[in-house]
């Protein structure tokens, strides 16, 4: 309820705390409705309650509707490092070309991703979604929900080895972000990554276009140099068309 705005729908997620305990407070703060699995005892039956069997499934249904309604470009970002910073930098650049909506903070899990979709104004030109993982088979369903036009894999490292047996498994999981891409979609990958070749192998299984970037001379978009000046980072790059 802390971030609730007047007119918002309150999602009563059951996690470490039961969101149903805060429905009454949400209505006091101006919520237009609440998505719940049951009616809380301290809430009148006359209040606008959207009662579903499972709040998480209900949230995903709302997110799916929001995605189908959205007509702008969708970019999904994953990787072992740099997801949030990449999201913020990309949002800054794209703001010169239209209205941008991006995931708040690190909203990148099974709750944060659908919340991002639901909160996206339908008149936005761009939506940037961050997709993270803690365990196996988490990225694919989120990519299917998001249906991005462009996917970005920042890098693959040993950051998730607590849940995976090897970096190979992590690379495979990260490549699953391509599941939601259509055949004309693009996956952007760092050519400087130690796992680049492995990522390309897995990404090719989805039949999407691969765009590489980095300092490696074989990069499609090659970074020549970066300079920090007047509290700004300036980059010089060679684009594919020169």
Indicate residue ranges for each PLM-predicted region.
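N-terminal leader/targeting and accessory segments in enzymes
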Residues: 1-61
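ATP-dependent carboxylate-amine ligase
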Residues: 3-9, 14-19, 149, 163, ...
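Short, polar loop motifs at secondary-structure junctions
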Residues: 34-42, 191-194, 215-216
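Adenine nucleotide phosphate-binding catalytic loops in nucleotide-utilizing enzymes
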Residues: 49, 167-168, 201-204, 208-242
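Hydrophobic residues at beta-strand termini and immediately following loops
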Residues: 52, 103, 213
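Phosphate-binding loop of NTP-binding sites
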Residues: 57-191, 195-206
